[in-house]
């Protein structure tokens, strides 16, 4: 199955490497040779709408199954509905939430109200934590490892029998007892926050729930039911373990504490293509999936100093240079949506990332556009460092580093106006992590220079994503760092076999992140509201 996928993706027969990059990753792949790849991997315009509908309960006869990695809020699909009891006062719902075993249920929501938050079970059932609802709602949880049908539904129903086990399906049985006051508005939308699929860690052969993107991608590659169906022998496990370590690196937070560099929290729709699903998953770690030497390699996003240098001894033809990206490929801001854990996993906008330099760090001789005169401290006198006035939007060439807390944008001055990339993050639920991914996308887009180098066969050792140093006297390159984004086979002008290496400039600085880079995110959180159904005795009378 994997071979067929590779053949379908690698449309050029000469290609020896396959990269499944993430949508935003290839937004920076410039040059005619990469334009086809860029178009193929750009994000779907309706991705944000799809994300927003994941907590909505559906009732479809042929609904696609879902795979949940990390933690997610999901509405599920009603696969069975029946009324029982006197006057049909009891309504039974079977809501399937995942097509596999999950680790745990953490909470249940009716519309926008949390009715259960992991409280005590009673005989395998949970009652609503909401005081007014508790007599009318009972929920039975099944994690997908069940070996028998739900006993309560089996006993109450004449149609649901002991044979209805729903193997390998995580589902809830929800029993609602009719009450005009509680359900006057009709059937509530039912959603649940769950810890999703347990995955294998190849470093110690343990299986447990994890938010590590590398381990979850490894699981999807090996999944014979819904994934790529690859064997372990065809996956370079050393790359899995290395990527796992990168994802687990601790990032310091401005508010104190740390967070893992990358996590994955979201839902894979099995109706989506394997290619698009892998792209979305690798996006959670700013990474890539490479097929090289007969094995898949998983790489998490990080800067690795080059250990290979290309010089005149390896070059067999003229280097093609593109010094600047088109306006369509370059942008100076990144914005988008994510499913915010701070807002109970509803669709939210993460703080937009734009080019910003704080006073004290301006580079003399460079042109900037004023963004703010003050940013939480003393104001900046931009007229003292080359500006004609202290006015937001004015361009100036810095004559000094500046003082105070004012900010200015290098990229806005270069482009003349704001150009945003709209980047949805379907597997990122933390606003700071979303900001880091967006900032990385922004800085990578500003790496303007792309080259195609015809090399001898020694270049066959390169893989997509490798950083290389290039030394060339004519172009003035002295170990200039580029990232390999593609290559093809061809012939040089004198008939030699050539490996045409396509690369784009890169730098370690684009991976830098400081707590001062964090923008304020105004999350809604949870609010306790009086529901009007319980009388509270007055006090202090």
What are these regions (language model features)?
Residues 2-8, 24-283, 292, 339, ...:
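Polar, S/T/G-rich
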Residues 217, 368-370, 382, 393:
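Extracellular/surface recognition and adhesion modules
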Residues 345-355, 411-490:
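Long hydrophobic segments that form regular secondary structure
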Residues 303-304, 372-382:
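Acidic glycine-/aspartate-rich tracts in secreted/extracellular proteins
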Residues 102, 362-364, 462:
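Short, well-ordered loop/turn sites that connect or cap secondary structure elements
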Residues 100-106, 311-356, 411-429, 513, ...:
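Acidic, small/polar-enriched beta strand-loop surface segments
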Residues 316, 464, 469-540:
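Acidic, low-complexity/disordered segments
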């Amino acid at each position: 199955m994997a071979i067929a996928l590779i053949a379908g993706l690698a449309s050029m027969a000469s290609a020896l490497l396959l990269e499944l990059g993430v949508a935003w990753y290839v937004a920076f792949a410039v040059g005619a040779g990469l334009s086809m790849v860029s178009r193929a991997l750009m994000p779907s315009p309706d991705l944000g709408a799809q994300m927003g509908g994941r907590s909505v309960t559906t009732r479809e006869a042929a609904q696609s199954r879902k795979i949940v990695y990390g933690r997610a809020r999901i509405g599920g699909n009603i696969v069975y509905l029946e009324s029982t009891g006197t006057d049909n006062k009891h309504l039974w719902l079977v809501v399937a939430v995942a097509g596999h075993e999950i680790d745990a249920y953490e909470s249940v929501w009716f519309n926008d109200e949390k009715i259960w938050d992991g409280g005590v079970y009673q005989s395998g059932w949970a009652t609503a934590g909401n005081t007014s609802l508790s007599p009318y709602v009972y929920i039975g949880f099944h994690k997908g490892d069940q070996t028998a049908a739900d006993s309560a539904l089996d006993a109450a129903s004449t149609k649901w029998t002991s044979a209805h086990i729903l193997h390998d399906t995580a589902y809830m049985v929800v029993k609602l007892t009719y009450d005009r006051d509680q359900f006057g508005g009709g059937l509530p939308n039912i959603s649940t926050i769950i810890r999703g699929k347990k995955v294998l860690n190849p470093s110690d052969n343990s299986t447990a729930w994890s938010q590590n993107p590398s381990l979850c991608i490894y699981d999807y590659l090996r999944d014979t039911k819904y994934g790529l169906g690859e064997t372990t022998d065809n996956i370079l496990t050393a790359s899995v373990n290395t990527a796992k370590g990168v994802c687990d690196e601790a990032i310091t937070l401005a508010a104190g504490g740390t967070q893992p560099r990358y996590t994955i929290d979201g839902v894979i729709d099995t109706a989506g293509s394997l290619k698009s699903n892998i792209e979305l998953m690798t996006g959670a770690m700013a990474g890539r999936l490479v097929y090289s030497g007969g094995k898949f390699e998983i790489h998490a996003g990080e800067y690795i100093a080059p250990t290979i240098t290309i010089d005149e001894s390896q070059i067999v033809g003229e280097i093609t240079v593109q010094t600047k990206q088109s306006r369509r490929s370059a942008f100076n801001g990144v914005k988008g949506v994510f499913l915010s854990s701070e807002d109970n996993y509803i669709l939210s906008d993460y703080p937009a990332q734009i080019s910003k330099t704080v006073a004290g760090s301006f580079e003399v001789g460079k042109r900037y556009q004023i963004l703010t005169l003050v940013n939480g401290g003393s104001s900046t006198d931009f007229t003292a460092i080359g500006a004609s006035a202290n006015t937001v939007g004015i361009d100036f060439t810095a004559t000094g580093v500046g003082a105070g807390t004012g900010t200015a944008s290098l990229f806005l001055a270069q482009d003349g106006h704001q150009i945003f990339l709209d980047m949805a993050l379907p597997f990122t639920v933390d606003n700071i992590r979303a900001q880091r991914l967006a900032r990385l996308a922004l800085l990578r887009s500003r790496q303007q220079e792309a080259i195609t180098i015809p090399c001898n066969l020694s270049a066959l050792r390169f893989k997509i994503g490798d950083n290389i140093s290039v030394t060339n006297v004519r172009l003035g390159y002295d170990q200039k760092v580029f990232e390999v984004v593609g290559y093809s086979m061809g012939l040089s002008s004198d008939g030699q076999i050539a490996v045409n290496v396509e690369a784009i400039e890169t730098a370690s600085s684009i991976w830098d992140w400081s707590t001062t880079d964090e923008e304020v995110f105004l999350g809604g959180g949870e609010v306790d509201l009086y529901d009007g159904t319980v009388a509270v005795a007055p006090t202090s009378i």
